[in-house]
């Protein structure tokens, strides 16, 4: 009986985790398609989001962008290079430390970002209930998880 309960409980946790992953993948898939429709790779859209979300009194360094994008420093440099060639971002030396580069959106980057943000919010609105339900199920499954 206990094995049946454990397997039922484990099955419920797996189901909750799978549903959450599915809902996230659906949104991420939408994001990739929407970005490509605007002529940019999804990773460049994500880069622009990180830059735009910086606190107003700060500027985006390559190190900060790498951390927020969960990329290696050299991969972030390459991503910024591609976005700069596309006219989405501009890079300048940090006046306080000339070895550091600071990255900001260009006006073209801001236009594309604003359009994509609006599309993403419109897409996300009807999915919120599914995502919230999946998160609540995960939370409940985690709370019922036996402690190791």
What residue spans do the PLM features occupy?
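N-terminal helix-turn-helix DNA-binding core of bacterial DNA-binding proteins
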Residues: 29-72
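Pre-recognition alpha-helix immediately N-terminal to the DNA-recognition helix
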Residues: 19, 26, 46-50, 111
């Amino acid at each position: 009986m206990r094995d049946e309960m454990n397997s039922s409980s484990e099955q419920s946790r797996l189901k909750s985790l799978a549903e959450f992953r599915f809902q996230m993948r659906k949104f991420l898939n939408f994001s990739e398609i929407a970005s490509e429709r605007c002529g940019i790779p999804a990773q460049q859209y994500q880069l622009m989001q990180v830059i735009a979300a910086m606190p107003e009194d700060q500027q985006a360094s390559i190190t900060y962008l790498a951390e927020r994008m969960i990329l290696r420093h050299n991969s972030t440099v390459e991503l910024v290079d591609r976005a700069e060639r596309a006219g989405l971002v501009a890079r300048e030396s940090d006046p306080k430390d000339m070895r550091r580069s600071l990255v900001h959106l260009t006006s073209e980057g801001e236009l594309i970002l604003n359009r994509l943000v609006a599309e993403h919010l419109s897409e996300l609105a009807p999915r919120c209930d599914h995502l919230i339900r999946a998160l609540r199920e995960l939370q409940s499954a985690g709370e019922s998880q036996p402690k190791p």
